[in-house]
Protein backbone atom coordinates (compact mmCIF):
# COMPACT_ATOMS: atom_id res chain seq x y z
CA UNK A 1 0.00 0.00 0.00
CA UNK A 2 1.42 3.41 -1.00
CA UNK A 3 1.81 6.27 1.48
CA UNK A 4 -1.11 8.12 -0.13
CA UNK A 5 -3.28 5.00 -0.02
CA UNK A 6 -2.42 4.58 3.66
CA UNK A 7 -3.32 8.22 4.36
CA UNK A 8 -6.63 7.87 2.50
CA UNK A 9 -7.50 4.72 4.45
CA UNK A 10 -6.56 6.51 7.69
CA UNK A 11 -8.86 9.40 6.77
CA UNK A 12 -11.71 7.05 5.83
CA UNK A 13 -11.30 5.07 9.05
CA UNK A 14 -11.48 8.30 11.07
CA UNK A 15 -14.98 9.11 9.76
CA UNK A 16 -17.67 7.51 11.88
CA UNK A 17 -20.86 6.15 10.34
CA UNK A 18 -24.05 6.80 12.30
CA UNK A 19 -26.99 4.61 11.19
CA UNK A 20 -30.52 6.03 10.98
CA UNK A 21 -29.46 9.68 11.40
CA UNK A 22 -31.03 12.16 10.79
CA UNK A 23 -33.79 9.73 9.82
CA UNK A 24 -34.31 6.00 9.45
CA UNK A 25 -32.46 4.42 6.54
CA UNK A 26 -29.74 7.09 6.34
CA UNK A 27 -26.09 6.27 7.06
CA UNK A 28 -24.69 9.60 8.28
CA UNK A 29 -20.96 10.12 7.70
CA UNK A 30 -19.76 12.08 10.73
CA UNK A 31 -16.64 14.18 10.08
CA UNK A 32 -16.47 15.42 13.67
CA UNK A 33 -14.46 12.30 14.51
CA UNK A 34 -11.98 13.23 11.75
CA UNK A 35 -11.76 16.79 13.09
CA UNK A 36 -11.16 15.46 16.61
CA UNK A 37 -8.15 13.49 15.34
CA UNK A 38 -5.35 15.99 14.60
CA UNK A 39 -3.36 13.51 12.51
CA UNK A 40 -6.38 12.66 10.33
CA UNK A 41 -7.36 16.32 9.96
CA UNK A 42 -3.76 17.23 9.04
CA UNK A 43 -3.59 14.38 6.50
CA UNK A 44 -6.83 15.61 4.93
CA UNK A 45 -5.54 19.16 4.51
CA UNK A 46 -2.13 17.92 3.31
CA UNK A 47 -3.65 15.76 0.57
CA UNK A 48 -5.91 18.57 -0.66
CA UNK A 49 -3.03 21.06 -0.72
CA UNK A 50 -0.77 18.54 -2.47
CA UNK A 51 -3.42 18.03 -5.17
CA UNK A 52 -3.98 21.76 -5.83
CA UNK A 53 -0.48 23.20 -5.32
CA UNK A 54 0.77 24.97 -8.44
CA UNK A 55 -2.58 25.01 -10.27
CA UNK A 56 -2.91 28.81 -10.28
CA UNK A 57 -5.85 28.95 -7.90
CA UNK A 58 -6.46 32.50 -6.64
CA UNK A 59 -9.41 31.90 -4.27
CA UNK A 60 -10.85 29.04 -2.27
CA UNK A 61 -14.60 29.11 -1.65
CA UNK A 62 -16.04 27.10 1.24
CA UNK A 63 -19.74 26.35 1.48
CA UNK A 64 -21.45 26.74 4.85
CA UNK A 65 -20.66 25.36 7.25
CA UNK A 66 -18.39 22.35 7.03
CA UNK A 67 -16.74 23.63 3.86
CA UNK A 68 -15.20 26.33 6.05
CA UNK A 69 -13.40 23.70 8.15
CA UNK A 70 -11.47 22.40 5.15
CA UNK A 71 -11.49 25.33 2.73
CA UNK A 72 -9.93 27.91 5.05
CA UNK A 73 -6.83 25.85 5.97
CA UNK A 74 -6.36 24.85 2.31
CA UNK A 75 -6.54 28.52 1.24
CA UNK A 76 -4.04 29.47 3.94
CA UNK A 77 -1.59 26.77 2.85
CA UNK A 78 -2.01 27.72 -0.83
CA UNK A 79 -1.43 31.38 0.06
CA UNK A 80 -4.74 32.58 -1.41
CA UNK A 81 -7.91 34.21 -0.09
CA UNK A 82 -10.79 32.27 1.45
CA UNK A 83 -14.38 33.21 0.57
CA UNK A 84 -17.30 31.88 2.63
CA UNK A 85 -20.60 31.08 0.91
CA UNK A 86 -23.29 31.30 3.55
CA UNK A 87 -26.98 30.76 4.11
CA UNK A 88 -29.19 33.76 3.35
CA UNK A 89 -28.89 36.70 5.75
CA UNK A 90 -25.55 35.75 7.33
CA UNK A 91 -23.16 38.02 5.37
CA UNK A 92 -22.92 41.72 6.35
CA UNK A 93 -22.06 43.40 3.03
CA UNK A 94 -23.86 43.49 -0.31
CA UNK A 95 -24.47 39.95 -1.54
CA UNK A 96 -25.48 37.92 -4.55
CA UNK A 97 -28.01 35.13 -3.88
CA UNK A 98 -28.71 31.76 -5.46
CA UNK A 99 -31.72 29.61 -4.60
CA UNK A 100 -31.53 25.86 -5.13
CA UNK A 101 -33.77 22.84 -4.62
CA UNK A 102 -33.64 20.53 -1.64
CA UNK A 103 -35.39 17.18 -1.23
CA UNK A 104 -38.34 19.00 0.36
CA UNK A 105 -38.27 22.71 -0.54
CA UNK A 106 -35.57 25.22 -1.38
CA UNK A 107 -32.65 27.01 0.26
CA UNK A 108 -30.63 30.11 -0.59
CA UNK A 109 -26.89 30.69 -0.53
CA UNK A 110 -25.15 34.07 -0.64
CA UNK A 111 -21.70 35.42 -1.44
CA UNK A 112 -20.29 38.93 -1.03
CA UNK A 113 -20.49 40.71 -4.40
CA UNK A 114 -16.91 41.96 -4.12
CA UNK A 115 -15.31 38.63 -3.15
CA UNK A 116 -14.68 37.17 -6.63
CA UNK A 117 -13.56 38.89 -9.84
CA UNK A 118 -13.18 37.83 -13.45
CA UNK A 119 -9.47 37.28 -12.78
CA UNK A 120 -10.10 34.60 -10.15
CA UNK A 121 -9.54 30.86 -10.60
CA UNK A 122 -11.65 29.36 -7.85
CA UNK A 123 -11.48 26.05 -6.00
CA UNK A 124 -14.71 25.12 -4.22
CA UNK A 125 -14.41 23.01 -1.05
CA UNK A 126 -17.08 21.20 0.94
CA UNK A 127 -17.05 18.19 3.23
CA UNK A 128 -19.43 15.93 1.32
CA UNK A 129 -20.79 15.42 -2.18
CA UNK A 130 -24.21 13.77 -2.25
CA UNK A 131 -26.64 15.05 -4.91
CA UNK A 132 -24.50 18.08 -5.82
CA UNK A 133 -27.18 20.74 -5.38
CA UNK A 134 -25.33 22.89 -2.85
CA UNK A 135 -22.03 22.96 -4.71
CA UNK A 136 -23.82 23.55 -8.03
CA UNK A 137 -25.48 26.65 -6.51
CA UNK A 138 -22.07 27.74 -5.19
CA UNK A 139 -20.60 27.42 -8.70
CA UNK A 140 -23.42 29.52 -10.15
CA UNK A 141 -22.63 32.30 -7.65
CA UNK A 142 -18.93 32.23 -8.56
CA UNK A 143 -19.68 32.28 -12.29
CA UNK A 144 -22.20 35.12 -11.92
CA UNK A 145 -19.40 37.17 -10.33
CA UNK A 146 -17.14 36.37 -13.30
CA UNK A 147 -14.88 33.83 -11.60
CA UNK A 148 -13.67 30.62 -13.21
CA UNK A 149 -14.54 27.45 -11.32
CA UNK A 150 -11.48 25.20 -11.55
CA UNK A 151 -12.79 22.24 -9.56
CA UNK A 152 -14.80 21.14 -6.54
CA UNK A 153 -13.00 19.27 -3.74
CA UNK A 154 -14.71 17.04 -1.20
CA UNK A 155 -13.56 14.92 1.68
CA UNK A 156 -16.40 12.41 1.21
CA UNK A 157 -18.40 11.37 -1.84
CA UNK A 158 -21.55 9.27 -1.86
CA UNK A 159 -21.41 8.19 -5.53
CA UNK A 160 -24.77 6.39 -5.43
CA UNK A 161 -26.56 9.76 -5.09
CA UNK A 162 -25.44 11.08 -8.48
CA UNK A 163 -23.60 14.24 -7.48
CA UNK A 164 -20.53 13.58 -9.64
CA UNK A 165 -22.66 13.20 -12.77
CA UNK A 166 -24.73 16.28 -11.93
CA UNK A 167 -21.60 18.40 -11.56
CA UNK A 168 -20.03 17.00 -14.74
CA UNK A 169 -23.15 18.07 -16.69
CA UNK A 170 -22.44 21.62 -15.46
CA UNK A 171 -18.78 21.40 -16.47
CA UNK A 172 -17.59 21.07 -12.87
CA UNK A 173 -14.87 18.50 -12.25
CA UNK A 174 -14.61 17.05 -8.76
CA UNK A 175 -11.86 15.62 -6.60
CA UNK A 176 -12.75 13.44 -3.63
CA UNK A 177 -10.58 11.84 -0.98
CA UNK A 178 -12.87 8.98 0.09
CA UNK A 179 -16.04 7.31 -1.18
CA UNK A 180 -18.73 5.61 0.85
CA UNK A 181 -21.50 3.44 -0.61
CA UNK A 182 -25.17 4.17 -0.01
CA UNK A 183 -26.67 7.32 1.37
Curated annotation (Swiss-Prot):
Entry GO CC: cytoplasm
Cysteines paired by S-S bonds: none
Record flagged with keyword Transferase: yes
Enzyme Commission number(s): 2.4.2.7
Cross-referenced PROSITE patterns: PUR_PYR_PR_TRANSFER
Reaction equations catalysed: AMP + diphosphate = 5-phospho-alpha-D-ribose 1-diphosphate + adenine
Key words, A-Z: Cytoplasm, Glycosyltransferase, Purine salvage, Transferase
Assembly: Homodimer.
Function field: Catalyzes a salvage reaction resulting in the formation of AMP, that is energically less costly than de novo synthesis.
Listed NCBIfam families: apt, PRK02304.1-1, PRK02304.1-3, PRK02304.1-5
Protein name from the UniProt record: Adenine phosphoribosyltransferase
Organism: Proteus mirabilis (strain HI4320)
Lineage per the UniProt record: Bacteria, Pseudomonadati, Pseudomonadota, Gammaproteobacteria, Enterobacterales
Amino acid sequence: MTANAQQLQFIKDSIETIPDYPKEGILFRDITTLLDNPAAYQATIDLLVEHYQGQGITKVVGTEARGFLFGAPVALRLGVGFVPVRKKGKLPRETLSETYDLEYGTDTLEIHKDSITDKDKVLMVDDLLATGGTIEATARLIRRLGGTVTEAAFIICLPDLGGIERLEKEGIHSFTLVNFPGH
